[in-house]
């Protein structure tokens, strides 16, 4: 019961901190916090210029999360999202270079503008298939 009360206090403080930056979106803030607690993914669809990126940055700051943003375009490759192995000449081995999804909060902007292979790589990462072998 004590943990539940502490979680509620923490979520309220986080919501209050986010509301200092994001005005008039109280219901969305609560829904995003609930989804984050459940370990889910969030899809924000809206017209340009209404503060989706600002909201993501506010969340990352309020919750002390590592934040990455990627603008998806036709030239973004799957490895940009998920990472890749690069040869290390000094050791003769391959070093993993993590992609943009290796963070706590990842904002994928304009997903529809990229190739289907890159979209598939993003969906695999969202399903948790990417990263298990790398961490």
Regions found by a protein language model. Give the residues of each.
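Conserved, well-folded catalytic cores of nucleic-acid-processing
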Residues: 14-17, 21, 25, 35-39, ...
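Conserved small/polar residues in nucleotide/adenosyl-binding loops
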Residues: 133-135
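Walker A/P-loop
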Residues: 36-74, 87
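Pre-Walker A (pre-P-loop) alpha-helix and adjacent loop at the N terminus of AAA/AAA+ ATPase modules
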Residues: 4-50
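Conserved AAA+/SF3 P-loop NTPase catalytic/coupling segment centered on the Walker-B
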Residues: 100-127
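Conserved alpha-helical scaffold flanking the Walker A/P-loop in AAA+ ATPase domains
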Residues: 31-34, 87-107
């Amino acid at each position: 019961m004590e943990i539940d009360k502490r979680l509620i206090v923490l979520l309220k403080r986080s919501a209050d901190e986010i509301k200092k930056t994001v005005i008039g979106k109280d219901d969305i803030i609560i829904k995003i916090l609930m989804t984050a607690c459940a370990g889910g993914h969030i899809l924000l669809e809206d017209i340009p210029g209404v503060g989706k990126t600002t909201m993501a940055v506010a969340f990352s700051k309020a919750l002390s999360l590592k934040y990455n943003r990627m603008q998806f375009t036709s030239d973004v490759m799957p490895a940009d999202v998920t990472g890749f192995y690069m040869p290390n000449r000094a050791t003769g081995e391959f070093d993993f270079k993590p992609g943009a999804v290796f963070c706590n909060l990842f904002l994928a902007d304009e997903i529809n503008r990229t190739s289907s292979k890159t979209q598939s790589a993003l969906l695999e990462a969202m399903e948790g298939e990417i990263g298990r072998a790398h961490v």
